[in-house]
């Protein structure tokens, strides 16, 4: 037989040539299944029996012990030893006569059936499952020379069998393996056209020796390993195989070629022969496992990639089931039963065939088709053992799944310990006893097992006991629970509970939906069953036990994690649920009705709707937002406050920490924003706008507050030590949220103040005398009522100049009232410092310190308005001189050092010119700043804290320090101002007045001054490149290095909107080299320029010798090295 097949394959080109010449047509059943695309879930096992034809060459002396019924798909076996007994023996042994054995299968084939019908029936469910992503397997089992090769491989000759009516072609005689290859590729092509999925098919083949159980499995395609790259299966494999070679097969002919190669290697590996049951010698072929690996993927609707790997196994056990050192057929049956029943450790695990079969058949989604083969020429025992193994696998497949039982029965069986395991293993008894004793109920309630005639027991024939027994075995009695009366039905109880809840619900719609449901449930007096009641700590109101968690003893809603059931309480909840069902429960979500959801959505859509009865759990809390829940329990004894309802102590601590962290961040950001010049200018503008809109205020406010830092305290959450009463649900509606702070988007230069508003504001200020008298009255009242507030913190340090000025002003008072007299009269003075927090200093400074800060705010407001009035329209003379230059701004002298970083604020230019001419007065007609000081009453601002070691800013040595250096600048500016304005007020007077204001203001307030707009014309802005009045110098000149390097950089003052690095000294030096409109340089400017160049060379010579890091740190912006002299260094 092997020689014949080999010659046919070599002569006709094998299966590859057969598929090229005449591929087998796809059967109609397979076409219907591929078009329907059924959902293949748990794998099925389909068992078929194929009986070969009787060999005509053999004698017909053997009795026929096998009867076939193809209509019923049954086979009947009769023992030939008891088929024709003698009459005497029959009478003596009448009770001992063995009945014929009947076996039923999914399909039954004989020699009269075509090969294509056998392949179509075996592969009709396997190939669609593989295309859907599941595994499929076709297994041929039986003793050697029983027709397994005919089923799997077929014949390459002309006819299919002796029962063929007409001679069919080669396509009708192909076996299941070539047909599976052809039909699988056709299905892949159709699936690719319909769904657009991409497929990749690879082939592998493994052989197992039939007579050497210790031999390892052999890779039959190892010779073609160099033709293919690494398989994707190496990333998916986790089995015993170790990875056979997977060769890429893009076409069906390529896969068939690999099948021919595997068969050639299989024949070489079989070397022993044995005597078959028919008496002829035949070689024992090794087992063959031919696998088609299908890799597919497609793009899903959501943009992802869906796909994976599926496998189609074609297994021919060949001659493994033999008695010459191989594995017996009963052993193969036990392996199959163990694997298909889900056992972890199948028998004969040392045999190389066992892990291979487990890898193919173990997946639960694998669809298996088993074809058992028998021959009439076999002995009765061999045929019976083969059919019994196939029948046991068939019964295993048809075993009904367990009926889903109620929870009570399942728990009772689990707790009792008498429950059976999930899957029963193979029957360890022999096949004879198993076939005689197993009785099951057929599809029509027939008491037959498919192997014997119906056997009726006496206990089942009386009355209707048979029907009751059938229902009991099928489990129908457990599916239907006993019916109850209509009054006690769960639906009636649900309706009653719903009606009761509707009556008890309050009329308010602002509460939480779940709290209303909980209130109705708790307040309802009609509860069907008795629930254990407990009381909250010190509360007289009872609460149902199922609403209270064991850890916190505080009522908790159903959606909280505290309510999750644990295994210990499963039986208790089951017993309560079996007694009566109180209310409808939504297991996987909140218990909210559809009407309440619609009501909540309607309330949330309203714009002006604010829920007043809910608490913002993770945000600010206020006294007005108290939660009014149904279980609003008072505290026990007044000492214990209510918490967050269902939250435990850990969650409460986390929320408190979160609130504290957010409070700290908000406070820091607000303080930093309020200290910036932009924020301060905006706050003062808002204050001034409010003061203009409000009616006239009284002369004195007995409780002044620090208005500058007020928003930072308002933005903090109100930390209430007592949490709100009652519990709060997580999914409550939105509560009242404080409005967001307005954003400051307008530039500072766009904030213009009219002259009318300024005069109106000045008229509302009190005079200096009234303010001083009010301060004295307030200080006396505060000292009489609160004597402890007179002790100001030692953090407010004073200097000797301030003490001297205070003593000179208070000469008429008692000499003993010295500011430091308390230190000499008190023996033990111990005051607690308040340097820890910035907020404590404001509360401990007393009334006087707050009044001083209020005065500082008003002074800043007035000074800002006066600077706004300084926006004058320049005359023609100014345009003719240097109106287009950045040096055209007036010079102001500040009493600070030349190397100070906080020298003077940078002045911002107006972004756009006004559409109307300015009606503000000129610079020469500015109001008297001394009069402003007298009106505002700023005499006491010198008492504010100065830096440690600072001298009196009112001393005149600060003015004399810079006056000699700016004589020429003052002369030049006075001439230009006199020509432009034509009035007697010179720049020195305005400068002197400005210095007086600067001396009164502390240094911290000076740094917060708003930006002074120089001109209302857009032409006043100079980019440094288009100005005609600025001298054009080369890149390496001294002027460019002086103007573009380091600290005195023109770009630093011009380009930065909030730069404060341009000092008055540097501006004065720039004015010395300013060129007039006619291009002539003044003599004073030329002399100053020469002196500056001489000083610059001297500094460059010194810088060449001082290149150390310390020298650069001392003078970082004036240290220029000779080798980098020509380059620009902008910081």
UniProtKB/Swiss-Prot annotation:
Residues 483-494 have a biased composition (Low complexity). Residues 1-25, 472-494, 693-753, 905-926, 1016-1072 are annotated as: Disordered. One of its GO terms (molecular function) is ATP binding. Keywords: ATP-binding, Cytoplasm, Cytoskeleton, Microtubule, Motor protein, Nucleotide-binding. Residues 44-396 form the Kinesin motor domain. It is found in: Cytoplasm, Cytoskeleton. GO terms for cellular component: cytoplasm; microtubule. Gene3D superfamilies: Kinesin motor domain. InterPro entries: Kinesin-like_fam (IPR027640), Kinesin_motor_dom (IPR001752), Kinesin_motor_dom_sf (IPR036961), P-loop_NTPase (IPR027417). PANTHER family: KINESIN-LIKE PROTEIN CG14535. This is Kinesin-like protein CG14535. It comes from Drosophila melanogaster (Fruit fly).
């Amino acid at each position: 037989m092997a020689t014949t097949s080999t010659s046919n394959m070599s002569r006709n080109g094998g299966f590859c040539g057969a598929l090229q010449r005449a591929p087998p047509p796809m059967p109609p059943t397979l076409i219907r299944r591929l078009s329907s695309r059924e959902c293949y879930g748990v794998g099925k096992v389909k068992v078929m029996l194929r009986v070969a034809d009787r060999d005509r060459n053999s004698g017909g002396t053997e009795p026929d012990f096998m009867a076939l019924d193809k209509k019923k798909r049954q086979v009947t076996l009769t023992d030939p030893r008891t088929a024709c007994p003698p009459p005497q023996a029959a009478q003596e042994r009448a009770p001992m006569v063995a009945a014929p054995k009947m076996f039923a299968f999914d399909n039954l084939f004989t020699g009269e059936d075509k090969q294509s019908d056998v392949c179509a029936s075996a592969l009709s469910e396997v190939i669609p499952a593989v295309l859907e992503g599941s595994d499929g397997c076709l297994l041929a089992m039986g003793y050697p020379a029983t027709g397994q090769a005919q089923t799997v491989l077929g014949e390459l000759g002309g006819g299919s069998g002796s029962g063929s009516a007409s001679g069919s072609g080669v396509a009708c005689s192909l076996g299941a393996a070539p047909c599976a290859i052809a039909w699988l590729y056709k299905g892949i092509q159709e699936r690719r056209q319909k769904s657009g999925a991409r497929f990749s098919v690879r082939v592998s083949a493994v052989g197992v020796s039939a007579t050497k159980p210790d031999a390892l499995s052999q890779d039959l395609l190892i010779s073609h390993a160099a033709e293919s790259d690494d398989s994707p299966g190496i990333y998916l494999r986790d089995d015993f195989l170790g990875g056979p070679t997977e060769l890429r097969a893009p076409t069906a002919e390529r896969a068939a070629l690999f099948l021919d190669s595997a068969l050639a290697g299989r024949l070489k590996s079989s070397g022993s022969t044995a005597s078959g049951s028919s008496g002829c010698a035949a070689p024992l072929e090794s087992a063959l496992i031919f696998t088609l690996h299908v890799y597919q993927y497609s793009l899903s609707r959501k943009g992802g990639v869906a796909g994976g790997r599926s496998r189609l196994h074609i297994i021919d056990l060949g001659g493994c089931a033999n008695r010459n050192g191989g594995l017996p057929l009963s052993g193969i049956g036990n392996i199959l039963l163990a694997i298909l029943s889900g056992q972890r450790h199948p028998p004969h695990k040392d045999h190389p065939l066992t892990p291979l079969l487990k890898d193919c058949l173990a997946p639960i989604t694998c669809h298996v088709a088993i074809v058992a083969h028998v021959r009439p020429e076999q002995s009765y025992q061999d045929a019976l053992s083969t059919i019994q193994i196939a029948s046991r696998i068939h019964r295993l497949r048809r075993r009904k799944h367990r009926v889903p039982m109620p929870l009570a029965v399942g728990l009772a069986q689990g707790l009792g310990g008498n429950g059976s395991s999930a899957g029963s293993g193979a029957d360890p008894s022999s096949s004879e006893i198993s076939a005689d004793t197993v009785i099951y109920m057929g599809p029509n309630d027939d008491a037959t097992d498919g192997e014997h005639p119906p056997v009726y027991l006496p206990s089942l024939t009386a009355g209707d006991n048979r029907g009751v027994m059938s229902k009991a075995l099928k489990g129908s009695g457990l599916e239907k629970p006993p019916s109850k009366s209509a009054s006690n039905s769960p639906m009636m109880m649900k309706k009653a509970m719903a009606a009761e809840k509707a009556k008890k619900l309050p009329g308010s719609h602002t509460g939480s939906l779940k709290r209303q449901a909980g209130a109705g449930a708790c307040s309802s007096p009609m509860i069907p069953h008795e629930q254990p009641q407990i009381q909250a700590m010190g509360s007289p109101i009872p609460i149902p036990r199922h609403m209270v968690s064991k850890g916190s003893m505080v009522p908790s809603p159903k959606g909280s994690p505290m309510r999750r059931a644990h295994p210990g309480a499963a039986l208790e909840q089951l017993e309560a649920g079996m007694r009566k069902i109180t209310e409808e429960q939504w297991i996987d979500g909140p218990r909210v009705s559809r009407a309440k959801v619609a009501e909540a959505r309607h309330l949330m859509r309203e714009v002006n709707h604010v829920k007043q009865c809910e608490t913002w759990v993770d945000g600010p809390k206020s006294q007005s937002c108290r939660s009014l829940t149904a279980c609003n329990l008072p505290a026990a004894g007044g000492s214990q406050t209510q918490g967050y309802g269902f939250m435990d102590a850990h969650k409460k601590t986390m929320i408190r920490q979160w609130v504290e962290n957010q409070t700290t961040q908000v406070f820091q950001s607000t303080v930093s924003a309020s200290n910036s010049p932009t924020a301060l200018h905006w706050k003062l503008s808002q204050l001034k706008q409010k003061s203009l809109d409000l009616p006239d205020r009284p002369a004195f406010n007995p409780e002044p507050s620090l208005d500058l830092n007020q928003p930072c305290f308002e933005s903090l959450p109100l930390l209430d030590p007592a949490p709100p009463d009652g519990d709060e649900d997580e999914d409550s509606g939105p509560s009242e949220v404080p409005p967001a702070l307005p954003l400051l988007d307008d530039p500072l230069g766009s904030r213009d103040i009219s002259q009318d508003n300024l005069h109106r504001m000045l008229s509302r200020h009190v005079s200096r005398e009234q303010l001083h008298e009010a301060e004295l009255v307030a200080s006396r009242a505060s000292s009489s009522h609160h004597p402890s507030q007179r002790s100001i913190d030692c953090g407010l340090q004073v200097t000797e100049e301030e003490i001297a000025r205070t003593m000179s002003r208070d000469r008429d008072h008692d000499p003993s009232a010295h500011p430091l007299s308390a230190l000499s009269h008190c023996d033990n003075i111990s005051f607690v410092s308040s340097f820890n927090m910035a907020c404590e200093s404001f509360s401990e400074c007393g009334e006087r310190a707050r009044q001083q800060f209020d005065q500082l705010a008003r002074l800043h407001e007035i000074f800002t308005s006066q600077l706004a009035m300084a926006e004058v329209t320049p005359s023609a003379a100014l345009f003719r001189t240097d109106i287009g230059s950045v040096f055209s701004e007036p010079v102001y002298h500040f009493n600070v050092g030349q190397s100070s970083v906080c020298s003077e604020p940078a002045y911002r230019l107006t972004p756009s010119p006004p559409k109307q001419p300015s009606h503000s007065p000129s610079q020469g007609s500015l109001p008297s700043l001394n009069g402003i000081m007298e009106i505002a009453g700023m005499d006491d601002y010198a008492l504010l804290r100065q830096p440690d070691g600072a001298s009196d800013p009112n001393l005149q040595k600060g003015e004399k320090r810079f006056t000699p250096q700016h004589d020429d600048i003052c002369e030049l500016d006075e001439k230009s101002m006199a020509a432009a304005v034509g009035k007697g007020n010179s720049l020195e007077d305005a400068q002197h007045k400005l210095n007086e204001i600067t001396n009164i203001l502390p240094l911290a307030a000076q740094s917060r001054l708003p930006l002074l707009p120089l001109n209302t014309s857009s032409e006043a802005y100079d980019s440094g490149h288009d100005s005609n009045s600025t001298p054009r110098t080369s890149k390496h000149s001294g002027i460019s290095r002086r103007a573009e390097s380091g600290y005195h950089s023109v770009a630093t003052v011009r380009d930065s909107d909030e730069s404060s690095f341009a000092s008055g000294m540097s501006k004065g030096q720039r004015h010395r080299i300013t060129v007039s409109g006619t291009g002539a340089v003044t003599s004073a400017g030329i002399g100053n320029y020469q002196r500056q160049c001489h000083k610059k060379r001297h500094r460059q010579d010194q810088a060449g010798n001082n290149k150390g890091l310390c020298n650069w740190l001392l003078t970082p912006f004036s240290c220029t090295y000779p080798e980098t002299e020509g380059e620009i260094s902008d910081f």
